[in-house]
Amino acid sequence: MVFGDIHFLNRRYEPWDAYAQSKTANVLFAVEATRRWGGDGITVNALQPGTVRSNLQRYITDEDLERTRVHIEDENGSFHWKTPEQGAATSVLLATSPLLQGIGGRYFEDCNQAGPSQPGTGRGVAPYALDPDAATRLWEISLQTLAS
């Protein structure tokens, strides 16, 4: 998170950086929401559904997709689109599994809690995305933004 310029007003807008920052914000929100509401039985988690082909990519050129492909290939250097059902699996698990009762502030991928990030793979969760101080800071900035 670039807290001093969340909206890219003072730096060059790069779509993939903005996307990555929004994904980090999702995880930070889960951390802070669980801290605030977990005592009331409300937990929040973040997840990565995987690469599901959808209309979200309609404005992304094939060149841009190819450029990012290296970041989302598997350990064998292969790239596969998930089906919508495969992409939904982690969401369904988080929403319905009794095994996750009371578990919050975490990041999941492929129906499992994500491990530490693995550079160059697009897998795992970076430590800064789970930082409770950053989560609180983002929460406060969000409140200020909503109040204005």
Language model: regions and residue ranges:
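Short glycine/proline- and charge-enriched loop/turn segments
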Residues: G4-R12, L65-I72, S117-A126
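Short, contiguous clusters of charged residues that form electrostatic/catalytic patches at enzyme active sites
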Residues: L28, A89, E140
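C-lobe helix-loop cap of protein kinase catalytic domains
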Residues: A30, V92-T96, L143
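Non-catalytic terminal and boundary segments that flank Rossmann-like NAD(P)-dependent oxidoreductase
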Residues: M1, A126-S148
